[in-house]
């Protein structure tokens, strides 16, 4: 078993997703837009499921995730504890079935902005469960099937728009030509379903709003130079955060791009995908990587 995948056992049957918001939680200062880079390559063992959690709520505090056969027996998962905005956990491997899941303020197991009473996970399937809306409207999670294709000698890419107040965006070449990711809106992914294939190699892309954004007008905030795309790998990039919090810094240079560590679900580090990630959002984007824990 890959040491990067955590096993949970003793959990039950099948069902649907039900969620409630409980307990008082204070909102934090809204965070700027970020691209969260995750490596999707790999597959669960037969009869198992993989699930990971993305903290994308721009004003929610750091959280711990509790999992059990039901909410009453849910226990903290060490590798899903202390998640802060813009972080995505490693995959957790579980038997197919239904799980009670609580998302609680870090260190406060009774202060839980989200309770998922019945999260159904199918066998031989990978999932990302994301919280993307502001805390006050965090009613339901976004659940995505990570339907990675078989390797074909190219890189597989998808972009997921999870910024609730950000308009549509396009990814363009330096000459202004489309690469096929245009008009991506919240809360959608591109492609849908599946992933786009890109030949391995070096790419030089920029990201622009699909329409003018006040007060800046035409906005192309990301232009990091040529980046490398690796063959045989699958990636997701999730756009999270608040455009309103980002626009005052829209003309600032983007932050440095950092690849995932060797404890991500897989260790490949295609920085290009962080560029493509920005197709899900606009305005002074800072790119971050998946968080890895032991």
Language-model regions: role of each:
Residues 2-12:
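Bacterial N-terminal signal peptides that target proteins for export
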Residues 3-4, 21, 123:
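Intrinsic low-complexity, intrinsically disordered segments enriched in polar/basic residues
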């Amino acid at each position: 078993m890959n040491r990067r995948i955590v096993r949970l056992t003793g959990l039950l049957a099948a069902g649907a997703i039900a969620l409630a918001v409980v307990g008082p939680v204070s909102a934090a200062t809204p965070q700027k837009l970020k691209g969260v880079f995750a490596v999707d390559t790999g597959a669960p063992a037969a009869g198992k499921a993989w699930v990971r959690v993305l903290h994308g709520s721009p004003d929610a505090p750091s959280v711990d995730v509790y999992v059990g056969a039901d909410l009453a027996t849910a226990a903290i998962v060490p590798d899903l504890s202390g998640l802060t905005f813009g972080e995505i956990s490693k995959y957790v491997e579980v038997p197919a079935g239904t799980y009670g899941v609580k998302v609680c303020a870090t260190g406060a197991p009774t202060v839980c902005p989200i309770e998922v009473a019945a999260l159904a996970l199918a066998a031989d399937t990978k999932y990302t469960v994301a919280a993307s809306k502001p805390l006050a409207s965090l009613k339901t999670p976004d659940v995505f099937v990570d339907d990675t294709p078989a390797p074909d000698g190219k890189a597989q890419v998808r972009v997921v728009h999870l910024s609730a107040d950000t308009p549509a965006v396009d990814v363009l070449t330096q000459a202004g030509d489309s690469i096929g990711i245009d008009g991506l809106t919240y809360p959608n992914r591109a492609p849908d379903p599946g992933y786009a294939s890109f030949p391995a190699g070096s790419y030089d892309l920029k990201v622009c709003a699909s329409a003018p954004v006040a007060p800046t007008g035409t906005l192309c905030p990301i232009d990091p130079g040529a980046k490398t795309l690796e063959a045989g790998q699958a990636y997701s990039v999730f756009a999270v955060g608040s455009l309103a919090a980002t626009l005052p810094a829209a003309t600032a240079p983007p932050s440095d791009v950092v690849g995932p560590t060797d404890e991500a679900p897989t260790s490949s580090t295609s920085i290009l995908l962080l560029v493509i990630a920005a197709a899900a959002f606009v305005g002074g984007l800072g790119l971050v990587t998946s968080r890895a824990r032991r």
